[in-house]
Amino acid sequence: MGEIEGTYRVLQTAGMRLGAQTPVGVSTLEPGQTLLPRMQEKHLHLRVKLLDNTMEIFDIEPKCDGQVLLTQVWKRLNLVECDYFGMEFQNTQSYWIWLEPMKPIIRQIRRPKNVVLRLAVKFFPPDPGQLQEEYTRYLFALQLKRDLLEERLTCADTTAALLTSHLLQSEIGDYDETLDREHLKVNEYLPGQQHCLEKILEFHQKHVGQTPAESDFQVLEIARKLEMYGIRFHMASDREGTKIQLAVSHMGVLVFQGTTKINTFNWSKVRKLSFKRKRFLIKLHPEVHGPYQDTLEFLLGSRDECKNFWKICVEYHTFFRLLDQPKPKAKAVFFSRGSSFRYSGRTQKQLVDYFKDSGMKRIPYERRHSKTHTSVRALTADLPKQSISFPEGLRTPASPSSANAFYSLSPSTLVPSGLPEFKDSSSSLTDPQVSYVKSPAAERRSGAVAGGPDTPSAQPLGPPALQPGPGLSTKSPQPSPSSRKSPLSLSPAFQVPLGPAEQGSSPLLSPVLSDAGGAGMDCEEPRHKRVPADEAYFIVKEILATERTYLKDLEVITVWFRSAVVKEDAMPATLMTLLFSNIDPIYEFHRGFLREVEQRLALWEGPSKAHTKGSHQRIGDILLRNMRQLKEFTSYFQRHDEVLTELEKATKRCKKLEAVYKEFELQKVCYLPLNTFLLKPIQRLLHYRLLLRRLCGHYSPGHHDYADCHDALKAITEVTTTLQHILIRLENLQKLTELQRDLVGIENLIAPGREFIREGCLHKLTKKGLQQRMFFLFSDMLLYTSKGVAGTSHFRIRGLLPLQGMLVEESDNEWSVPHCFTIYAAQKTIVVAASTRLEKEKWMLDLNSAIQAAKSGGDTAPALPGRTVCTRPPRSPNEVSLEQESEDDARGVRSSLEGHGQHRANTTMHVCWYRNTSVSRADHSAAVENQLSGYLLRKFKNSHGWQKLWVVFTNFCLFFYKTHQDDYPLASLPLLGYSVSIPREADGIHKDYVFKLQFKSHVYFFRAESKYTFERWMEVIQGASSSAGRAPSIVQDGPQPSSGLEGMVRGKEE
């Protein structure tokens, strides 16, 4: 049939058609026959287009999963934060699909030979500060460059020109008109960029001296504020047939009409996402759907498009909202319903924790355009701010936001000679439409080995030793320790200070902010944004800073605690509804308020032309509108009492919820007792009132912003007046709940009518001398306790004295013990000593007031709580109690509640114990207004360097973060007992706006940015420390555990 004689047609067997492998060693071919071409191929050659437009070839087995290819790409790029990225390709319908890691590639891509996959950013974080590596930020900048060119990142022409100018600065260095114009002729950044050419050049002139890393950061900072940042449209229509676009982001599912966002379904509102054929369904929580129907329906183009969008939503939700990946469900034996698709990478939380906890070593890299042109400042004036990496080992850490990232520059950049470039001919191809340059992947590989055997493959964290490279003298100037940036450095004993206390470490959480690593930061920045001198600007800035902290506090409940209870299915549905239906609306409101304040402050700090407009130098209109809206939330605030009560009851009834609750309180993100965060919404209202009073006091009645601020103050005062009694009741309930958990040996501490008055450390006279005890004064009784087993957070009840019939007398002369007084109770008499005369006066005043109140209360006093430990036989009323037992005896008795050997030691109870002081109910109430957040510079102890930290002051404690986006603090410093003052001449501090914190031998210096912020920090710290009182060391005849502890801390600090 037309076949040439002597040849044979090869017939496919059933096994060949099904893809079965031919047995090796036995040939079934006739002489002269060969295998089919597709049978000869043992590997697929996949082309991947990287973000710098270079092409790479990857060889993989045909049946391997997508993860194999992804792993090869990450390895070749040396990309550590790989979970932000993915591989995308176009299907036959020409829309982009993400390569699935857990699915075979040949089941996803029909013709792998003809498909070009491209590396792309998959998850866009809300803030570039969350990206840990400089290399990751560089890749993100390249992604935004691609989005600009493909018109995905739509924005105003001026903004597009500004972004392009920063990209130019990053790629070719400082402004040079001839070079700029030539570069822009060859490289396209914007569609029709000729129209914006002059504006791009004008902006580029202003970036002189800006390093590539700083330029990348500026690109990300500008882009993240745009509406279309990270948005990928999926065409759809609603039930009425209106054409819309769906998208997904870190906050939830978004709905657009054109380029206008018309709705946002936040993750906290969404109960379930599903699809059925072409219909995409969003099921809302019953308590939040409001005027909407329970389930919203959108129609996409096809089933595949619908399923693709659903998968992206699942991945975004898991990555940004969950603490870790959900456990895979067991497969059905016979039938399965629905998709088995799950996100298979690390969550953002896991990724950030991995970097913070693992001490990753950063690998240097080289930019694609680094050989074109280099900023002069990068080579000379600001060497520490721009890290220059030589293959021979010269490396200096620096970055706009990450001190551990590295930027590499090849020696050919410094010596523009005719040296040949390396070329990876084995695995690098060039797209005909792509400039032929060496990819960062190849450059990172070559950079790792170019130095030969003497070159270290990876530098340790911290300041590496500067090693001379070729052509560099060993006498080259080295950056001083104070001119290098670093993360917050802690001594080894306090490396994880906010999680559970480690066994063997000091129980007092007093961070030693040391110079470990030798890294510092010179606070003299060469360029500053324009800062208005008006005090109102700094008040608004305080509103913004404290609002950011407040939102983070709310997220402890709305995001982190919700995730914990949902994951374990530990909370009853009724309590879930009660809790989150009261917190979520408040959280959403404050998110919008924060956005408004951020935008207004950005205009306030903006260029002088925009700044001359009076509308930008005001905040009253925003405050008035939002303070009035807060009135509508009064009913939510009023139910927080019920929420707190029901949560406490549920934890007692449900052991699973109790376990999740306790476990969650040990997490770093829960830096205060969990129920404390339920008080934050009402406490925040008092803070608004305080700041509005400051604004009104600053403005004259004729000021254009005075009227709005005055009306806003009036509105918020009405709300706080209504809620004042609720806050008092809430604070008391929260404190009793906290004590019930931490005190062992007492039942039913929470009772109607019982009020907390004071807690603190006194020394009780026993036969063995003065023994340290923790005392708790309530409206009807006085408890005293001893510290439980070492390493636990519990105090064991040692005695309960009713206030009825109690008498308190001074007894300094009788016992020859300073600051002592005697407490006569109905069945017992004890002698106690305070640390100072001030402490003694506070205790005696509160005791006498409480005794008088209990006497006048009569029969209305609550029943005394029961004891769960054996009590001693009653003594004669005239007998003075001289206890036989000591702290060693106390360790012999241990309750089952003390099973949790880990605890958080920055609560007021533990700080009072170790600082030998006390705190009253009035002090706690005053601390509500003494809250502050903002950036401070902390001075290193052993150098002249300063380190920029985000600092939060709340609950008598300073919490330190690297940036305001961090989810949990790196360290904390309880301030009870500390004094705050201005440095003396002997301290050698020659800077403005510096204040000094001191407790015994522990001294810290912090520097504020302005006179106003300096005075505010001094005010709030003085208000907290003076109200609670400072406690110098006590002269004792007996043991002094607190002194020994401070000595241990001091020894570690030195």
UniProtKB/Swiss-Prot annotation:
Biased amino acid composition, Low complexity: 468-492
Residues recorded as bearing Phosphoserine in the entry: 389, 439
Domain FERM: 44-324
UniProt-listed SMART domains: B41, FA, FERM_C, PH, RhoGEF
Protein keywords: Guanine-nucleotide releasing factor, Phosphoprotein, Repeat
Ranges in a coiled coil: none
InterPro entries: Band_41_domain, DBL_dom_sf, DH_dom, Ez/rad/moesin-like, FA, FARP1/FARP2/FRMD7_FERM_C, FERM/acyl-CoA-bd_prot_sf, FERM_2
Residues covered by region (Disordered): 421-527, 856-894, 1029-1054
Top-level taxonomic group: Eukaryota
Alphabetical GO biological process terms: actin cytoskeleton organization; cell adhesion; hair cycle process; neuron remodeling; osteoclast differentiation; podosome assembly; Rac protein signal transduction; regulation of integrin activation
Function of the molecule: Functions as a guanine nucleotide exchange factor that activates RAC1. May have relatively low activity. Plays a role in the response to class 3 semaphorins and remodeling of the actin cytoskeleton. Plays a role in TNFSF11-mediated osteoclast differentiation, especially in podosome rearrangement and reorganization of the actin cytoskeleton. Regulates the activation of ITGB3, integrin signaling and cell adhesion.
Domain remark in the UniProt entry: Intramolecular interaction between the DH domain and the PH domains can stabilize the protein in an autoinhibited conformation.
Protein name, entry field: FERM, ARHGEF and pleckstrin domain-containing protein 2
Organism of derivation: Homo sapiens (Human)
Name of the gene this protein is made from: FARP2
